[in-house]
C-alpha cells in the first residue's frame, strides 16, 4: 500500500472514533492534578507557571474590559502550543494542521472582538477611515479597510495551518531521503540526519512561536476594539 505525504494530515478513525477527538484531549491529560506530586508533574507545573507568567505580559497594554480576555487567550495559547508540540512526536496526529479547526478558533474570537467594537457605533466606524484622509480617497480607503477587517480571521487560520503543514512535510521529506540514502550513501545519509535534527529543533521553535503569534494577533485586534 502506497502512502502519500499528505496522509499524515488525514484524521484516522479508530473504533468509529475520529483520532482528532482523542488528540484534542491530550493537552488536558498533561495538566497535573493537585494530588499528584511526583517529579515529572512538579516540573510540568513549573513550566506551565513560567509560560503563564511570561505570556500574560502581552495583555498589559489592554484596557480593563480587555483584561477579562486574559484567561481565555492564555488558555488558548497553552492549548495551541501543546497541540503543536505533541504533533511533532512520531505517529501522532496534529489537529492544528486542519484549517477547519484553526478557522473554528479564529472566526468566533475575531467576531467577538468586532461585536465588542460595534457597541459604540461611531467608534467602530472610525476604524474604517484613518484620520486626516483626503476626501477623494475616502471611498477607496473604506473599501480597503473593510476588506482587511474581514480577512483577519482567514489570515489567522491560514497562517497557522500553512506553517505547521509545511514544517511537517519538510521533516517527512528529509526523513525519507535519509532512510533511502542510508544503504546507498551512508555519509550523505548521516549529513541528512543532522539536517533533520536541526530542522526538528526549528519546528519545535515554530510550534511555540505560531501559538504565540496567533494569540498575539488576537490581543492586538482586541486592543483596537476595547
From Swiss-Prot:
GO terms of biological process kind: proton motive force-driven ATP synthesis; proton transmembrane transport
Disulfide bonds: none
Main location: mitochondrion
Transport keyword on record: yes
Transmembrane segments: 13-33, 69-89, 97-117, 138-158, 179-199, 201-221
Top-level taxon of the source organism: Eukaryota
InterPro entries in UniProt: ATP_synth_F0_asu (IPR000568), ATP_synth_F0_asu_AS (IPR023011), ATP_synth_F0_asu_bact/mt (IPR045083), F0_ATP_A_sf (IPR035908)
Reaction equation(s) it catalyzes: H(+)(in) = H(+)(out)
Keyword terms: ATP synthesis, CF(0), Hydrogen ion transport, Ion transport, Membrane, Mitochondrion, Mitochondrion inner membrane, Transmembrane, Transmembrane helix, Transport
Gene3D superfamilies per the UniProt record, alphabetical: ATP synthase, F0 complex, subunit A
GO cellular component, one term: mitochondrial inner membrane
Annotated compartments: Mitochondrion inner membrane
GO molecular function: proton channel activity; proton-transporting ATP synthase activity, rotational mechanism
Family annotation (Pfam families): ATP-synt_A
Topology of this chain in the membrane: Multi-pass membrane protein
Membrane listed as a keyword: yes
SUPFAM superfamilies: F1F0 ATP synthase subunit A
Record text on subunit structure and interactions: Component of the ATP synthase complex composed at least of ATP5F1A/subunit alpha, ATP5F1B/subunit beta, ATP5MC1/subunit c (homooctomer), MT-ATP6/subunit a, MT-ATP8/subunit 8, ATP5ME/subunit e, ATP5MF/subunit f, ATP5MG/subunit g, ATP5MK/subunit k, ATP5MJ/subunit j, ATP5F1C/subunit gamma, ATP5F1D/subunit delta, ATP5F1E/subunit epsilon, ATP5PF/subunit F6, ATP5PB/subunit b, ATP5PD/subunit d, ATP5PO/subunit OSCP.
Role according to the record: Subunit a, of the mitochondrial membrane ATP synthase complex (F(1)F(0) ATP synthase or Complex V) that produces ATP from ADP in the presence of a proton gradient across the membrane which is generated by electron transport complexes of the respiratory chain. ATP synthase complex consist of a soluble F(1) head domain - the catalytic core - and a membrane F(1) domain - the membrane proton channel. These two domains are linked by a central stalk rotating inside the F(1) region and a stationary peripheral stalk.
Family, as annotated: Belongs to the ATPase A chain family.
Protein name: ATP synthase F(0) complex subunit a
Record organism: Xenopus laevis (African clawed frog)
